[in-house]
């Protein structure tokens, strides 16, 4: 009996030391674990978002074949941007991105930018030293984007100053050649006649596809061109070297090249937002702001929706990848787990300055995440 009393006293003492028992302790611990899991998921998503932003900066420079971002100031950009219809059209009707991901197709993209339009401004040439007299305008250098693609359209754009009275203007585009025995230094490319009325000046385009193709085949024949636009009184209305107040009115070439068609296949995935509690692999929204990067050399878009992938890839969700599941079942410790990665990427169109201060309009593949999946 005495032993029983001693046991009871010891039991009561242990209860006093342990304190009151909380019946909700297990549920609170479970809730804390769930909150910690959600917090870890948020941190993981934030890490993926930051990594995606840095990867985008590297990818853009790499796909544009630029070692570093072009160092062009905002003031220089304002002076270099031509105030011309084709450029305004590209900016005003700019298709920032194609977010038609509902079809679930996966593009087999090339890595580098697919150029669609190149706007080339005139520059100086050492070849002009071979002739006694330099032309009034102009010499154009062509990047590898033009040289290595099929040219489908090439137009020379010139600006004609306004007139005070109605007049007929005779426009002539001449190609500079090496002096011949009879002293001839020019050969005609195009000529046209147009009527101008008083008012503002006008932009006029001239087809130069044939001469451009000849220049690409024989680069040594590209010595430059001369532009003349004479009214009935013999006044030259063409802006070749802009005067004060005529910034952005330089002549320029607009060249369009072929685009490579893409193949596609089917694919599907989950879409989530930043407040989602979904743990599985999912696509999350992410907006890239080029102005925040300090990348003023990108004319358009100033920002675009890039998106990113984040989430778990449990083998429970991998009916789509049976081979991965079988490998894991055979060797669960030795096989690497699947990762949440993009399974559908789409391009963006971009208008930008390259390192030679040329304006390029191109399509950059693989810049928008449209679908995410485990692989």
UniProtKB/Swiss-Prot annotation:
Classification of source organism: Eukaryota, Metazoa, Chordata, Craniata, Vertebrata
Family, similarity comment: Belongs to the TGF-beta family.
Annotated site (Cleavage): 98-99
InterPro entries on file: Cystine-knot_cytokine, TGF-b_C, TGF-b_propeptide, TGF-beta-rel, TGFb_CS
Protein name per Swiss-Prot or TrEMBL: Growth/differentiation factor 8
Propeptide intervals in chain numbering: 19-266
Entry keyword set: Cleavage on pair of basic residues, Cytokine, Disulfide bond, Glycoprotein, Growth factor, Heparin-binding, Secreted, Signal
Protein localization: Secreted
Broad class of the protein's primary localization: secreted
SMART domains noted in UniProt: TGFB
CDD domains: TGF_beta_GDF8
């Amino acid at each position: 009996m005495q032993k029983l009393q001693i046991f009871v006293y010891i039991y009561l003492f242990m209860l006093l030391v342990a304190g009151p028992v909380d019946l909700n302790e297990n549920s609170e611990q479970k809730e804390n674990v769930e909150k910690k899991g959600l917090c870890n998921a948020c941190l993981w998503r934030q890490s993926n978002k930051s990594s995606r932003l840095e990867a985008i900066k590297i990818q853009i420079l790499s796909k544009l074949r630029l070692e570093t971002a072009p160092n062009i100031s905002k003031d220089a950009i304002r002076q270099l941007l031509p105030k011309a219809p084709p450029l305004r059209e590209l900016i005003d009707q700019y298709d920032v991105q194609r977010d038609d991901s509902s079809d679930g197709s996966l593009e087999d993209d090339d890595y580098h930018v697919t150029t669609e339009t190149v706007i080339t401004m005139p520059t100086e040439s050492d070849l002009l030293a071979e002739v006694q007299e330099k032309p009034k305008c102009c010499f154009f250098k062509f990047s590898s984007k033009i040289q290595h693609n099929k040219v489908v359209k090439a137009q020379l754009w010139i600006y004609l100053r306004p007139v005070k009275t109605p007049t007929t203007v005779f426009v002539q585009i001449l190609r500079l050649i090496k002096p011949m025995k009879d002293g001839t230094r020019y050969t005609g490319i195009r000529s046209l006649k147009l009527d101008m009325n008083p008012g503002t000046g006008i932009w006029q385009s001239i087809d130069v596809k044939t001469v451009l193709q000849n220049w690409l085949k024989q680069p040594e024949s590209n010595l430059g061109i001369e532009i003349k636009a004479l009214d009935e009184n013999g006044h030259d209305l063409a802006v070749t070297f802009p005067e004060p107040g005529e910034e952005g009115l330089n002549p320029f070439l607009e060249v369009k090249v072929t685009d490579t068609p893409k193949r596609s296949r089917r694919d599907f995935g989950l879409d989530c937002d930043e407040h989602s509690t979904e743990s599985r692999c999912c696509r999350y929204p992410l907006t890239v702001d080029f102005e925040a990067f300090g990348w003023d050399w990108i004319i358009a878009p100033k920002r675009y929706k890039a998106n990113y992938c984040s989430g778990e890839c449990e083998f429970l969700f991998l009916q789509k990848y049976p081979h991965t599941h079988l490998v894991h079942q055979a060797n669960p410790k030795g096989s690497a787990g699947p990762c949440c990665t993009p399974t559908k990427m789409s391009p963006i169109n971009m208008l930008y300055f390259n390192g030679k201060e040329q304006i390029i309009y191109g399509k950059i593949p693989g810049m928008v995440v449209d679908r995410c999946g485990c692989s």
